């Protein structure tokens, strides 16, 4: 069993017009299933149920992209212009060995054609993988700024709150650890700009948005990742914090 850990920061504000607590969510440009397939995080055996499930969780456009058998296009759908040549070569050789050499992709296309429905692009809390010797909190702060453009001085960390969630996909366990922050008063206005101007953010995500609890529940019902068990307690913590603060 492989463990993959990501660290995130739930950053909240009180919307001064609606008088509701909101948090920032980001939407990835690609599904987790698509990323796992392109990076060859799967096994080839007689039972292809895990692969079919993986294809089920991809968007229709992602499945169509794989059916082209053009690994360059698949790779750069995730990485865009990022120069990761060594990793690319390693994954391409595995893709070629698994699917192109045996039958020129016929088996792969057949498996994709068995997929039913389609996945959605996830809305999630800004998060990412820690660098070597990087603390959990430092990772959460760095990833949050990379994905939203909001600097450390623009919010206050609430150290009493720390939550985690785990789920399994095939032979991989995904563990997410979350810290909590509240936005500075000067940035609470509803029209606060969230931009995608930095290349690091463009490469990973397609949308950034403030969402209240009703929206979080709606989003969670439409995707495989349920955000409510994490964001719900965070909002309750913020309510108590604001109550005692005032």
UniProtKB/Swiss-Prot annotation:
Source organism, top-level taxon: Viruses
Active-site positions on this chain: 143
GO annotations of cellular component type: host cell rough endoplasmic reticulum
Subunit structure: Interacts with host RPL23A.
Organism: African swine fever virus (isolate Tick/Malawi/Lil 20-1/1983) (ASFV)
Binding site for Mg(2+): 134, 143, 147
InterPro entries xref list: NUDIX_hydrolase-like_dom_sf, NUDIX_hydrolase_CS, NUDIX_hydrolase_dom, Nudix_hydrolase_domain
UniProt-annotated location(s): Host rough endoplasmic reticulum
Described function: Decapping enzyme required for the removal of the 5'-end m7GpppN cap tethered to viral and host mRNAs to allow their decay in cells. May therefore accelerate viral and cellular mRNA turnover to eliminate competing host mRNAs and allow stage-specific synthesis of viral proteins. Acceleration of the turnover of cellular transcripts may even promote the shutoff of host protein synthesis. In addition to the mRNA cap, g5R also efficiently hydrolyzes diphosphoinositol polyphosphates.
Statement: the UniProt record of this protein carries the keyword Hydrolase: yes
Entry's family note: Belongs to the Nudix hydrolase family. DIPP subfamily.
Sequence ranges assigned to domain Nudix hydrolase in this UniProt record: 91-239
One GO process term, biological-process aspect: AMP biosynthetic process
GO molecular function, one term: RNA binding
Alphabetic keyword roster: Early protein, Eukaryotic host gene expression shutoff by virus, Host endoplasmic reticulum, Host gene expression shutoff by virus, Host-virus interaction, Hydrolase, Magnesium, Manganese, Metal-binding, Multifunctional enzyme, RNA-binding
Needed cofactors: Mg(2+); Mn(2+)
Catalytic activity annotation: diphospho-myo-inositol polyphosphate + H2O = myo-inositol polyphosphate + phosphate
Keyword set includes RNA-binding: yes
Motif Nudix box: chain residues: 128-149
Enzyme Commission number, as recorded: 3.1.3.-, 3.6.1.52
Protein name per the record: mRNA-decapping protein g5R
């Amino acid at each position: 069993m492989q463990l993959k850990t990501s660290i995130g920061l739930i950053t909240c504000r009180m919307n001064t017009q609606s008088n509701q607590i909101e948090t920032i969510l980001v939407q990835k440009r690609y599904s987790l299933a698509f990323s796992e397939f392109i990076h060859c995080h799967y096994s080839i055996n007689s039972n292809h149920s895990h692969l079919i499930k993986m294809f089920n969780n991809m968007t229709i456009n992602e499945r169509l992209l794989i059916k082209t058998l053009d690994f360059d296009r698949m790779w750069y759908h995730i990485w865009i212009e990022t120069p990761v040549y060594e990793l690319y070569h390693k994954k391409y050789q595995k893709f070629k060995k698994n699917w192109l050499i045996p039958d020129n992709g016929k088996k792969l296309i057949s498996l994709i054609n068995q997929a039913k429905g389609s996945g959605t692009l996830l809305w999630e809390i800004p998060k990412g993988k820690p660098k070597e010797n990087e603390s959990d909190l430092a990772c959460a702060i760095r990833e949050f700024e990379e994905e939203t453009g909001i600097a450390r001085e623009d919010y206050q960390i609430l150290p009493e709150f720390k939550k985690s969630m785990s789920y399994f996909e095939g032979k991989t366990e995904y563990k997410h650890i979350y810290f909590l922050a509240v936005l500075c008063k000067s940035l609470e206005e509803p029209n606060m700009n969230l931009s995608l101007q930095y290349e690091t953010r463009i490469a990973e995500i397609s949308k950034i948005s403030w969402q209240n609890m009703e929206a979080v529940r709606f989003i969670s019902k439409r995707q495989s990742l349920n955000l409510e068990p994490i964001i719900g307690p965070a909002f309750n913590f913020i309510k108590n914090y604001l109550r005692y603060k005032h």
